[in-house]
């Protein structure tokens, strides 16, 4: 229903206020979604762990050539498709897949120019820190291996136990493992 639709920067989103993760929509990512929009023009965009598809919807408005949204939850894929239909009815530039992120990255054949990694928390407490850093390193390495030369990676950590320096080190380690040189364009916050 319309009372479950929220507006952000002129875009509409279905929100599940009762059963959604946290608030049902991550408002702390608003500025980062706008940044994705700015970089998307003419690009093949992959949004991993898409949930509501916020980044995907912004990439579409940013005139991406195509946008693929991936989430392990079929419910999330239904939600991103509903949000696309709300904003870009019938637009064939978007496809969504209910699939494990690592499996999708292994099998993907599309040459992506921009990849967004916004996974759920890998560590909610200090005891899980080592495994979380390993997970972030592995995930980012896989993205670096697959992204086109000159591509842009938006990568996020919402793990409270992982600080900014540890996350940055995981990303740079992933780049080195993949044989890719990287530079930070923006230090994002959420």
Where are these regions (language model features)?
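Conserved SAM-binding loop of SAM-dependent methyltransferases across substrates and taxa
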Residues: 52-65
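Conserved class I S-adenosyl-L-methionine
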Residues: 42-51
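Non-catalytic substrate-recognition/targeting regions of SAM-dependent transferases
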Residues: 1-26
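S-adenosyl-L-methionine
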Residues: 75-116
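Mobile active-site "lid"/loop adjacent to the S-adenosyl-L-methionine
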Residues: 112-142
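Helix-to-beta-strand junctions that scaffold the AdoMet/dcAdoMet cofactor pocket
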Residues: 147-149
């Amino acid at each position: 229903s319309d009372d479950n639709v929220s507006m952000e920067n002129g875009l509409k989103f279905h929100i599940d206020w009762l059963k959604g993760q946290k608030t049902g929509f991550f408002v702390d990512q608003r500025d980062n979604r706008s940044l994705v929009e700015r970089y998307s023009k003419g690009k093949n965009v992959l949004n991993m762990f898409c949930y509501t598809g916020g980044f995907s919807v912004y990439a579409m408005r940013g005139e991406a050539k195509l946008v693929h949204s991936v989430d392990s939850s079929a419910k999330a894929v239904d939600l991103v498709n509903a949000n696309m239909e709300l904003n870009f009815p019938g637009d064939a530039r978007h496809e969504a897949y209910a699939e494990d992120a690592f499996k999708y990255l292994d099998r993907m054949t599309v040459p992506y120019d921009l990849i967004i990694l916004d996974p759920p928390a890998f560590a909610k407490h200090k005891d899980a820190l080592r495994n979380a850093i390993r997970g972030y390193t592995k995930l980012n390495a896989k993205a670096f291996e697959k992204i086109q030369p000159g591509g842009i990676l938006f990568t996020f950590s919402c793990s409270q136990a992982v600080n900014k320096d540890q996350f940055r080190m995981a990303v740079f380690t992933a780049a080195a493992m993949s044989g890719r040189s990287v530079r930070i364009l923006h230090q994002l916050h959420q």
